[in-house]
Each structure stands twice: as C-alpha cells, then as structure tokens.
Amino acid sequence: YSSQLAQVQGLIGNVESQLAEIR
C-alpha cells in the first residue's frame, strides 16, 4: 500500500512540475 501511495505522490509531483513549466 505504501508503495502505491509513493507512486501516486510521484505522479502528482510530475504533473505539478509540468504545470510549472507551462507557467
């Protein structure tokens, strides 16, 4: 379960970094 949570956090971080690039 913890590994799945880490995957979700990594995915969110990736999306946030992409949004930062757009801005």
From Swiss-Prot:
> Record keywords: Coiled coil included?
yes
Residues covered by region (Coil 2): 1-23
Name the keywords, alphabetized. Answer: Coiled coil, Intermediate filament, Keratin
Q: Which GO terms describe its cellular component?
A: intermediate filament
Q: Where is the IF rod domain?
A: 1-23
Q: What name does the UniProt record give this protein?
A: Keratin
Q: Which organism is it from?
A: Cervus elaphus (Red deer)
Q: Give the classification, highest ranks.
A: Eukaryota, Metazoa, Chordata, Craniata, Vertebrata
Q: Which family does it belong to?
A: Belongs to the intermediate filament family.
Q: Which domain of life is it from?
A: Eukaryota
One further remark on this entry is: There are two types of hair/microfibrillar keratin, I (acidic) and II (neutral to basic).
